[in-house]
């Protein structure tokens, strides 16, 4: 509502003309930031007023108070302490609010000196915090990126451009994305905030981004993405004369990059960190995994959006934050280039063959810091001395890590390992700069002082000497004046009116002969003096704290500027350390969980021997149970496995584990199997399970058909398709027909690898005329009416689904199971196609939902009733009533 008002309407609403000067200042700033919650610094608190206060008090759970009236309207107010700001910001950002931080740009004393005692302290917004522009350690997940993305769709709409930046690490990337893959790419990146043109607000794309992916969209006017404007922004930011300095980029990529930089400038108030030139990547350089498949396979999050039970949580034994983020990126973007995959696998194999080195390196890596994010805070003037110390300790540890390699291999390291550890040699100049300037006990807050080593700068040493030894200097001056005057009782005292003064008794006045003693005050029994020396000392003592903090800030800024000059090296070092962490992690889990190096081919092989599902296996291990491994042998000649068998037997686990093995292999890790030979997979599609999507108005069947349609449209010969129960959301005949035709299409048109699980046993006859389709089933062991699921995949087809057995395991009443067996028997005795007639006959005689009384049921009820009777406590009347009740029951 406020966004639709003009300035005059806003002033009228808030009684601007009769507001105090301070409140007018607040309103001026608020009117310029209507889309934000405004946190207004007042002394030691950030205050919020009017509607902002009401919203914030609810979100933060803090008291809502009032700050007088503005005209007739009471002003709602709430506030948070400045030192606890980050704790409250977390809640506001999680609630999807943009927050404008308005700080005091001068002290109250400076304001008085400028404009008298009525002057209002100058304030302004120093930054705007949005989900995609956070850098505070406490506000962002340390083990995953925090992307801000800008999506630009040109008029031809065939290819969109996407630029994404992680402000906390200074990573910036641009990519062209086919229009059909936009949602999949956004699902891969999971940006915290997406910039989108206002023209797309009512589009299907915007609706899908918000509803299907649950991502936050920040709309901007169309001119925000104008090509000429964006090109100028890029040239100015990178100090270039020609846009070709970025590389070969399209017009829409220019708009995407420029709009991201402009948004950062607006939210960070020009205080943008040093960003490298955007990295231009090719869309098809990594495996395509659509958003539905990512959800089904629980790659980086579980089905509820948490981390526990995800593939990432199972594989993540990294020991650094930056290593965790790199592993997250690896899993989100598996490679599709065989050479690059094998390069990673060779690195993993090296560390797997050197587990003693891995153990030492992992212990050392724990001592390193997240220097990517330290560097960002430094470049944005939001760092502390501890950020510099973190860089120093990391430089020191890096050289020790390199020494571990040298001790083991000398100069005989493989080239691919030498390339990784080359940056670990450190930078002696940078290390010495920090070591010589920053105190080991440097505080978090620059305003606390004590960050610069005293010996680094003589003035710092002098000022700290005054702060620490002020009383000693006063004592020395007192002793000097006693000697000069001969007055042994002379004192130097202090009060708030005249400050430091020399105090003598009235009887000693005649001994004060030197004119340097200046009379200040006379009382009944005492006379007070001062001197130029004492006034100078007092001034130095009073100002020492302020002066040293100011000087330390100046020196600290200079040190930071020298660190920023080393930004490129520090980013390379961070990349090296995170890479070491991830590959040592791969070696660790390969050893810990018995993983094997996969082999890659350029054909359609998918030959997995004794494969296992890593997440399920780990869960079973916690219960001291073993996972039942299975083989999977897909090839040019046997591309499709049609898998039949009962529920709960392990079909879905088998389907998922093979998709997961492909993903793990193509990130460069060993895999949970005895052996694995894989033709590179360019896309993985998984349609496993469904639930009615009531929010989007889609039934289970519609959701299933939409996903299946997308799979058939986007798959290529090199894709891997995982389908479970296609067609189950409709009638049996419709379902069988759809599943049948889908299988034919995959076999004849796509010719890709596919695992297809179904309850439609009618489909198994397709192996007679589709040469690349083979039937497989789940092994079971029967004993009378009981069956045991063996969880083994074997060649052949299931003759029934064992659904009644599963229903019994689920706890359905015995009477329901018995009745179901009766009806099933009649179906099985009737030829295919007459089931409908049986159902009709049954419904005429007896409802399918009517439970015919039987002796077992009656006996059970009587037994239950008799157990509640105590004959000794029944009165004659109660006994008679009980007899009638039992007769009625029978």
From Swiss-Prot:
GO molecular function: ATP binding; ATP-dependent DNA damage sensor activity; damaged DNA binding; mismatched DNA binding
InterPro entries: DNA_mismatch_repair_MutS, DNA_mismatch_repair_MutS-lik_N, DNA_mismatch_repair_MutS/MSH, DNA_mismatch_repair_MutS_C, DNA_mismatch_repair_MutS_clamp, DNA_mismatch_repair_MutS_core, DNA_mismatch_repair_MutS_N, DNA_mismatch_repair_MutS_sf
Membrane-spanning parts: none
Annotated residues for binding of ATP: 645-652
Pfam families: MutS_I, MutS_II, MutS_III, MutS_IV, MutS_V
Annotated protein name in UniProt: DNA mismatch repair protein MutS
Family: Belongs to the DNA mismatch repair MutS family.
Organism: Rickettsia africae (strain ESF-5)
Highest taxon above the source species: Bacteria
Keyword Ligase included in the entry's annotation: no
GO biological process, one term: mismatch repair
Biological function: This protein is involved in the repair of mismatches in DNA. It is possible that it carries out the mismatch recognition step. This protein has a weak ATPase activity.
Keywords: ATP-binding, DNA damage, DNA repair, DNA-binding, Nucleotide-binding
Alphabetical list of CDD domains matching this protein: ABC_MutS1
HAMAP family recorded: MutS
